[in-house]
């Protein structure tokens, strides 16, 4: 029978203690959960947006499989995607995050542009010739006669409480003009 002795005490120097970074189990779990959510965001992307992101072949296959899976199989596949992301380098994960943020931000920029177009249309319809002149200075390629006719028709429709056909046409014209630049 072997005798049990004391565990040998390690002689740590201050330099060695400073190099060791202790990570709690909870922090590891939080990081794993965060990567799993990142994987879920990848699964939710459309195929066109997914093609814009450079992913490892195994990760791309796992994401495509998760998109086809349902219920429990999808949950397991998301766990697997999280595992693949945990084994990825920090640069790869940062690239994925930046790409996802860029895609989400692009959507927000488009929404802001559409709101700006609506506001511009309202200013043109409510405003006077000064607003039109300011618009023409900013967008010299605009068809002046066509836009004036649309604004005049929109004002007339509003006075007569008719359907806002010209109002919608102004918006479409502005959208085509500004977004084509």
Swiss-Prot record:
It is found in: Cytoplasm. Gene3D superfamilies: PSPTO4464-like domains (1.10.60.30). Pfam families: DarP (PF04751). One of its GO terms (biological process) is assembly of large subunit precursor of preribosome. This is Dual-action ribosomal maturation protein DarP. Belongs to the DarP family. HAMAP family: DarP. Keywords: Cytoplasm, Ribosome biogenesis, RNA-binding, rRNA-binding. PANTHER family: UPF0307 PROTEIN YJGA (PTHR38101:SF1). Its main location: cytoplasm. GO terms for molecular function: ribosome binding; rRNA binding.
